[in-house]
């Protein structure tokens, strides 16, 4: 609006008039003659003189950079044109005339500071003072400012509405004519981006907007704890390559897209009928303008491209892209513009497929010829090789026969010599055997003699030898008892060491300020158990996360439960499918709820938290975990991590108690 009011005034103002007004303002301000020139000139300046009607010479720059003119103050022929605005306070005739200008220096200045010398003083009388402006126009200025501010506010509101959905709702609902302005801007933007859209689509029948209809948000629009499960199922389904999907076929995607386009068309056709049935009141209104028929005739859809080349993934991918383009164009109502182009492209692709098939057949034929040539050469080489092998085999057979005969004669001679040596050795062995038998008989006689002597000596010393045998038996019994007691002592020592190792694990878990790993302590317990299956089973029942990262102590569990109880109370009033409003309401209600004390009975969240805290203070972690496990909904989801830590602590404690019990059983078995 402001631009439209300023544009006509720009056309009426001539350059000469503008320069006159500027020059008169310089004269009134005492700035006449203070002209600055550039210190450097790119081209020489050629001054010209233009005579006027009154004989005044007007200097003109030769490089057409700018033109200055000096007009006498008493010239009645040159006047500034009247302003197009009829509301101006100063009449066009009251504009002061510019004073007589002095000759302007046309050559570049040579002063040090780059400024021109002041013009010589003249005896021209000063111009008359301008008439005082009339007081008034305050309401006009206020109205102009109001219109300008309102326009800026509407422009900024429309711009923010196009960028922010929240501000769009506020602007269109609470600002007068805001919705119409936003719709107009969006329609103009759509027409600018799609100038031919109005020609291709039929006019849509629009009904009156229901101003009183409330906008509702469904109950299942909030957050849900099942999102992670759906994402995990989607990931598992996406990672399974054996399932049916886009990677199995290139044509199924095109069929699915074509089916989706047809479904959208069916919905669009069914939408007007449904709208007419649901709004019977509109039947009384005058009928709207009938839909116009499309300007262009409806073209027949282009058939999908089909090339019988299944072993070329590149061709299949290209065919899939072309079929996608054909499906999109067929779905568009303005497809008649692209039918010829797509048909030509389809024909080119079919020719390309035929050329690929022909090239493959030619390459296959050439490969078959090369294979036949190679096969013939191979058979010829094989026959030649067989002939050479037969010749070499015959030569080798003759040579082997000669070597065989020579070797047979050598073996016969060696066998004869060996027989002679064997006979000689057999004779020597028989002679040695006879000598050995004689020696054995002599030894047997000596042994018999010694036994007789020993029997006689034993009979004489029977009393003394009997006492020595009893002492030997007693010493053996003492040695056996000593060995048994040593094993008992070793077992007790191992049991004590196992008990000490278990106590070390328990103290490491109870005395640590933060959870820390206890792998070394478990390794010591396992080594001291010496392969005991009960101890090994107890250690293996502990979760690897527990002994690799550590478990919290009882004080840490209680402290963490107290922090958890605050969050659970905030979510205690939330339903399963809660939205943002439910979360806010539950948070505000948790601030005014009273905290119970003691052992309360009931299934509500506050009673369960009170009983759990009492059980934790008594050291009954198992019962406390059972109480927290009975929670439902968001309360159970919030306490899931705390329950996992408590389960790990219970597993470790149960395993340690089992190991201690096994150590006590060992002691009882030894006794």
Curated annotation (Swiss-Prot):
GO terms for biological process: cristae formation. Residues 117-133 have a biased composition (Pro residues). One of its GO terms (cellular component) is MICOS complex. The keyword Lipid metabolism does not apply. Residues 163-671 are mitochondrial intermembrane. Component of the MICOS complex, a large protein complex of the mitochondrial inner membrane that plays crucial roles in the maintenance of crista junctions, inner membrane architecture, and formation of contact sites to the outer membrane. Plays a role in keeping cristae membranes connected to the inner boundary membrane. Also promotes protein import via the mitochondrial intermembrane space assembly (MIA) pathway. This is MICOS complex subunit MIC60. It comes from Coccidioides posadasii (strain C735) (Valley fever fungus).
């Amino acid at each position: 609006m402001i631009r439209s009011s300023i544009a006509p005034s720009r056309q009426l103002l001539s350059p000469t008039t503008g320069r006159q007004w500027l020059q008169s303002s310089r004269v009134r301000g005492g700035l006449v003659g203070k002209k600055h020139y550039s210190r450097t000139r790119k081209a020489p300046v050629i001054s010209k003189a233009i005579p006027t009607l009154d004989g005044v010479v007007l200097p003109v720059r030769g490089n057409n950079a700018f033109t200055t003119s000096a007009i006498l103050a008493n010239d009645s022929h040159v006047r500034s044109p009247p302003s197009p605005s009829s509301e101006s306070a100063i009449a066009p005739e009251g504009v002061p005339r510019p004073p007589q200008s002095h000759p302007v220096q046309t050559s570049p200045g040579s002063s040090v500071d780059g400024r021109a010398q002041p013009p010589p003083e003249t005896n021209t009388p000063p111009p008359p003072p301008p008439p005082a402006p009339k007081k008034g126009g305050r309401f006009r200025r206020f109205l102009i400012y109001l219109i300008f501010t309102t326009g800026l506010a509407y422009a900024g509101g429309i711009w923010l509405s196009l960028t922010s959905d929240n501000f769009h709702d506020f602007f269109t609902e609470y600002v007068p004519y805001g919705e119409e302005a936003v719709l107009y801007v969006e329609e103009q933007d759509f027409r600018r981006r799609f100038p031919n859209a109005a020609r291709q689509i039929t006019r849509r029948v629009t009904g009156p907007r229901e101003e009183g209809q409330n906008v509702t948000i469904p109950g299942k629009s909030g957050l849900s704890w099942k999102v992670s499960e759906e994402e995990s199922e989607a990931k598992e389904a996406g990672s399974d390559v054996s399932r049916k999907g886009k990677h199995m076929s290139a044509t199924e995607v095109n069929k699915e897209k074509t089916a989706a386009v047809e479904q959208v068309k069916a919905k669009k056709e069914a939408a007007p009928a449904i709208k007419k049935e649901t709004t019977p009141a509109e039947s009384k209104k005058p009928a709207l303008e009938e839909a116009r028929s499309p300007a262009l005739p409806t073209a027949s859809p282009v058939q999908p491209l089909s090339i019988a080349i299944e072993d070329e993934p590149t061709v299949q991918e290209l065919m899939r892209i072309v079929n996608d383009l054909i499906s999109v164009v067929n779905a568009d109502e303005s497809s008649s513009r692209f039918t010829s182009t797509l048909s030509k492209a389809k024909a080119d692709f079919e020719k390309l497929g035929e050329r690929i098939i022909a090239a493959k057949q030619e390459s296959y034929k050439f490969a078959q010829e090369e294979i036949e040539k190679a096969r013939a050469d191979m058979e010829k080489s094989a026959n030649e090789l067989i002939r050479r092998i037969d010749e070499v085999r015959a030569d080798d057979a003759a040579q082997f026969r000669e070597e065989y005969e020579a070797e047979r004669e050598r073996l016969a001679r060696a066998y004869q010599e060996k027989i002679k040596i064997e006979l000689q050795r057999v004779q020597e062995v028989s002679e040695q055997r006879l000598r050995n038998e004689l020696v054995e008989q002599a030894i047997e006689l000596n042994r018999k003699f010694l036994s007789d002597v020993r029997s006689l000596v034993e009979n004489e010393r029977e009393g003394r030898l009997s006492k020595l045998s009893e002492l030997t038996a007693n010493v053996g019994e003492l040695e056996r008892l000593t060995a048994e007691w040593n094993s008992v002592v070793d077992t007790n020592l191992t049991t004590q060491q196992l008990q000490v190792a278990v106590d070390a694990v328990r103290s490491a878990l109870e005395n640590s300020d933060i959870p820390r790993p206890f792998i070394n302590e478990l390794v010591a317990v396992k080594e001291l158990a010496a392969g005991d299956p009960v101890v090994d089973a107890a250690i293996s029942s502990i979760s690897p996360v527990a002994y690799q990262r550590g478990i919290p102590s009882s004080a840490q569990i209680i402290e963490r439960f107290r922090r958890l109880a605050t969050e659970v109370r905030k979510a205690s009033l939330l339903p399963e499918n809660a939205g943002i409003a439910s979360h806010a309401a539950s948070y505000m209600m948790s601030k005014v709820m009273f905290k119970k004390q003691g052992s309360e009975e009931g299934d509500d969240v506050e009673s369960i938290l009170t009983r759990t805290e009492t059980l934790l203070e008594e050291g009954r972690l198992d019962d406390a975990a059972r109480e927290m496990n009975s929670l439902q909904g968001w309360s159970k989801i919030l306490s899931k991590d705390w329950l996992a830590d408590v389960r790990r602590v219970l597993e470790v404690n149960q395993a340690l108690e089992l190991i201690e019990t096994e150590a006590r059983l060992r002691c009882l078995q030894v006794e």
